C-alpha cells in the first residue's frame, strides 16, 4: 500500500457516498457505495477477503471520494460512475437499474407517473429513488388515491370511467375537472415530498381503523407504508437540477491559511464529475480569500469547458465580476434544493482540507516538532502535551474536551470529555471548570492520568488567567507549562500566548504551525461533536428534534451555523432557509412561535 493511499484511508469520511479505487496510472478499477465510507474502504484490506477482493486490493494505488447526503444519492451516483468508467472489477450494470422517478406529465390535463429515467420535459420530477428500498408502487397508488389526477383516456367524454367511480380520477370524462383543480392537486403532491404529514395522518387513521376491526395484517401494511413514506420524504433531497444544460456548484472552506475548493459538475440534471484543489494562502483576510477563489474560478474555466450556469456563495459584486469575465450566469443558491447540493459540495471541500492537513503533518518528524516547540518555549523537552476546548449549543449542554499527544502521537485512551455544569456562564468560566475537573482526575491514583508537560488552551489572555487561578487553588499540584493558541478575527489560528501573556508568532508555512493548527482543529471538532451528542441524548430538553422533519443531520447543520438553540429561535425564516429548505424553516418558526404564545 502506497504512503499516499494510507494517508487518504486515514481521513476517509465516515459519511454516505461513493469511492473510486484507482491503479498507479489513475485508471478507475472499481466504483463502490457505502453508508459509511470509512468502514467500507478499510474492509478491502482484511486478510480473510475472497480472492477477487485481494486481487483488487493488490492493484490499488489511490482512491477518490464523493461525499453525498444519503445512501439513495450514493446508489444513483454509483450507477452513473460505473457506466462512465466501466471499471474492470465492477459487474456490468443492467440498463434497468432499479432507480425510479415520480413525475407529473407536462400536459393540459396531467397525470402522475413512475419512470426509470429522468423526464426532463415534465412539469415536476422527484427522485431518483432506489426501488428496492422504498415501496414506490404502493406510494404511487396511495398518492393517486389521495390526490387524484386524470386517469382516463383524453378522448373519453360524458361517461364516467372506472377510476372516476372509485374516486381515483379528476373527472375529465365527466368534464368536472378544471385548471384550478389540477394546479391544487399538483401543489399537494409537491408539498408531500417536503411535508408528508397529511399522508402520514391518513395512514395512521387507516391503521387504527384496521386495528380496531382486528384486521391486523392490513394494519401492519399501513404501518409499513408509513415508514416507507417517512423514509422516502426524508431521503428526498432532490439532487436533480431541472434543466437540459450543464450546471456547476462550487463550494469552498478556508482554515488556518489553507483554502480547499470543490466543484460538482451536473449535466442534464445529474451529477457527472468532481474537481478539487487545495492550496496555502499567505493572507487570511476574507477579502484576500475571496480574491483567491475568484482567481481560481477564472483560471479553472480557461482550461475546462464552461457550464451554462455556476452556483457559488459569494457577494453580489464578486458574482458579477465572475459572470462578466466568463460571460455566463453566476449566482448564489436560489432555493432549498440548490442550498442542499452546495452544502454537500462544501462537505467534500472540508474532507479535502482534512486530507491535506494530514498530508502536511504526516511527513513531519513529530519528535523534532516537539523539540522545536520546547525551544520556542525555552524548556528542555516536551514529551507530552494536552490541548483543551469547550463547546456548547446552549448553556445547559456544555462539554469540555481534552486530547493528549505524546511525541506527536494522539493517545486516544487518555483523551477525556467532561460535562460542564456551572451557574457561571461564559467560555472563560467553562475553561476554568474544565481544568478544575482535569486536576481532580490527575490527583486520583485510580484515574492514572498524570499531567502532561504542556497544557494548550484554545484561547488568549482571559482563558490563561482563569486557568492559572485554578492551579493556584492546589498548593500540592505543580502546574504544567501553560500556553494559549489565539485565533484572529477570521477564527483562524494566529499566534501563541505564553503564561506571562507574551506573544510568540510562528511562520504560517512552518511544520510547527501546521501541527498546532491541526490539533487545535481536532480538539474543536471533538468538543463540538460531544456537545451535540449530549444535546441529542436529551431530546426532551431539545425541542428542535421534536419538530416533524427535523432529524439529527438537520439539527447539526443548524447548530453548526447558529451555535445556540436561542439563536435558532431568534433567526428569521430567510436566515434559516440559507441552510435548510424554506418549508422546514417556516415549520421551525411556527413551532417556536406557538411555544411563546
Curated annotation (Swiss-Prot):
Protein family (similarity comment): Belongs to the UvrC family.
GO cellular component, one term: excinuclease repair complex
Species of origin: Mycoplasma genitalium (strain ATCC 33530 / DSM 19775 / NCTC 10195 / G37) (Mycoplasmoides genitalium)
Domain GIY-YIG: start-end pairs: 14-91
PANTHER family: UVRABC SYSTEM PROTEIN C, UVRC/OXIDOREDUCTASE
SMART domains: GIYc
Compartment(s): Cytoplasm
Biological role: The UvrABC repair system catalyzes the recognition and processing of DNA lesions. UvrC both incises the 5' and 3' sides of the lesion. The N-terminal half is responsible for the 3' incision and the C-terminal half is responsible for the 5' incision.
Any GO MF annotation of the entry: DNA binding
UniProt-recorded name of the protein: UvrABC system protein C
Key words of the record: Cytoplasm, DNA damage, DNA excision, DNA repair, Excision nuclease, SOS response
Amino acid at each position: 500500500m502506497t504512503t499516499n493511499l494510507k494517508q487518504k484511508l486515514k481521513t476517509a469520511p465516515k459519511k454516505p457516498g461513493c469511492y473510486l479505487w484507482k491503479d498507479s496510472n489513475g485508471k478507475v478499477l472499481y466504483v463502490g457505495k457505502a453508508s459509511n465510507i470509512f468502514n467500507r474502504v478499510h474492509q478491502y484490506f482484511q486478510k480473510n477477503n475472497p480472492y477477487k477482493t485481494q486481487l483488487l486490493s493488490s492493484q490499488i494505488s489511490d482512491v477518490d471520494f464523493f461525499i453525498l447526503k444519503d445512501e439513495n444519492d450514493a446508489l444513483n451516483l454509483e450507477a452513473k460512475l460505473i457506466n462512465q468508467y466501466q471499471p474492470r472489477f465492477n459487474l456490468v450494470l443492467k440498463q434497468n437499474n432499479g432507480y425510479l422517478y415520480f413525475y407529473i406529465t407536462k400536459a393540459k390535463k396531467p397525470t402522475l407517473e413512475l419512470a426509470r429515467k429522468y423526464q426532463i420535459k415534465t412539469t415536476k420530477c422527484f427522485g431518483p429513488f432506489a426501488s428496492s428500498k422504498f415501496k414506490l408502487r404502493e406510494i404511487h397508488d396511495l398518492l393517486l388515491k389521495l390526490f387524484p389526477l386524470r386517469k382516463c383516456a383524453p378522448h373519453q367524454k360524458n361517461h364516467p370511467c372506472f377510476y372516476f367511480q372509485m374516486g381515483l380520477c379528476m373527472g375529465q370524462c365527466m368534464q368536472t375537472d378544471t385548471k384550478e383543480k389540477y394546479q391544487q392537486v399538483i401543489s399537494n403532491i409537491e408539498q408531500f415530498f417536503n411535508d408528508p404529514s397529511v399522508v402520514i395522518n391518513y395512514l395512521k387513521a387507516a391503521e387504527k381503523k384496521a386495528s380496531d376491526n382486528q384486521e391486523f395484517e392490513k394494519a401492519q401494511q399501513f404501518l409499513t407504508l408509513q415508514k416507507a413514506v417517512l423514509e422516502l420524504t426524508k431521503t428526498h433531497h432532490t439532487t436533480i437540477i431541472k434543466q437540459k444544460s450543464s450546471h456547476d456548484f462550487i463550494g469552498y472552506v478556508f482554515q488556518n491559511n489553507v483554502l480547499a475548493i470543490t466543484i460538482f459538475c451536473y449535466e442534464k440534471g445529474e451529477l457527472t464529475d468532481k474537481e478539487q484543489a487545495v492550496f496555502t494562502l499567505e493572507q487570511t483576510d476574507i477579502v484576500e480569500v475571496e480574491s483567491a477563489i475568484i482567481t481560481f474560478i477564472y483560471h479553472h474555466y480557461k482550461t475546462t469547458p464552461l457550464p451554462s450556469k455556476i452556483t457559488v456563495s459569494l457577494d453580489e459584486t464578486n458574482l458579477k465580476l465572475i459572470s462578466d469575465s466568463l460571460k455566463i450566469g453566476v449566482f448564489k443558491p436560489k432555493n432549498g434544493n440548490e442550498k442542499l447540493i452546495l452544502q454537500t459540495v462544501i462537505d467534500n471541500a472540508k474532507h479535502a482540507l482534512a486530507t491535506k492537513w494530514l498530508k502536511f503533518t504526516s511527513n513531519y518528524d513529530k519528535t523534532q516538532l516537539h523539540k522545536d516547540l520546547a525551544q520556542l518555549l525555552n524548556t528542555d523537552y516536551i514529551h507530552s502535551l494536552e490541548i483543551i476546548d469547550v463547546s456548547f449549543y446552549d448553556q445547559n449542554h456544555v462539554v469540555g474536551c481534552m486530547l493528549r499527544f505524546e511525541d506527536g502521537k494522539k493517545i486516544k485512551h487518555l483523551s477525556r470529555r467532561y460535562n460542564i455544569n456551572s451557574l457561571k456562564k461564559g467560555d472563560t468560566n467553562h475553561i476554568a471548570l474544565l481544568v478544575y475537573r482535569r486536576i481532580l482526575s490527575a490527583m486520583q491514583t485510580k484515574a492514572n492520568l498524570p499531567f502532561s508537560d504542556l497544557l494548550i488552551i484554545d484561547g488568549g489572555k482571559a482563558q490563561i488567567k482563569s486557568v492559572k487561578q485554578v492551579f493556584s487553588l492546589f498548593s500540592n499540584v505543580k502546574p504544567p507549562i501553560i500556553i494559549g493558541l489565539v485565533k484572529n478575527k477570521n477564527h483562524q489560528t494566529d499566534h501563541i500566548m505564553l503564561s506571562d501573556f507574551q506573544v510568540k508568532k510562528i511562520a504560517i508555512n512552518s511544520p510547527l504551525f501546521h501541527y498546532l493548527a491541526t490539533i487545535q482543529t481536532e480538539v474543536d471538532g471533538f468538543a463540538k461533536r460531544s456537545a451535540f451528542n449530549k444535546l441529542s441524548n436529551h431530546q426532551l430538553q431539545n425541542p428542535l428534534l421534536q419538530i416533524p422533519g427535523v432529524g439529527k443531520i438537520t439539527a447539526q447543520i443548524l447548530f453548526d451555523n447558529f451555535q445556540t438553540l436561542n439563536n435558532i429561535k431568534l433567526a428569521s425564516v430567510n436566515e434559516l432557509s440559507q441552510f435548510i429548505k424554506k418549508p422546514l424553516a417556516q415549520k421551525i418558526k411556527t413551532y417556536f412561535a406557538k411555544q411563546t404564545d
